Amino acid sequence: MSKDIIQGVWLSGKVHIITNQVVKEQIKPIAAGQTVVADCSHLLVFAAWDTYTAERINKVYDHLTEVRGFTNAGLDNYRQRLLNGYPPRDAEVNFAHAARQAYIAFSMAIVAAAFEGVDATPMEGFDPAALDELLGLREN
């Protein structure tokens, strides 16, 4: 992965911050030719996971405890509840949930950008399969 693509993770997916101009130009036709994709300084792609797995849940919580310095004891009950509830559910139910969570994360980013005085253009119109392939999202 390029150093020009930074990833952040939350329980339901990842945000990819793309600054590489070549990659942004490759995304433009995938985004119905919307020029703002190539013209922006930073393109944020909020990618929802297709389903929840024990591995993904554990990875997020292990990262959370490491970065924030939490003890596992404080999160173990919640983690266990997620592990017992999410992975066994139907993949379509999980994807719909993850997509809604992506919109929540996206909304927070837009609010933060506005607060900081950063111009932001919320948009849809991407070809999901083509974007998945270009950014290697299925492997992540």
Predicted regions and their residues:
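Acidic, surface-exposed loops and disordered segments
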Residues: 1-140
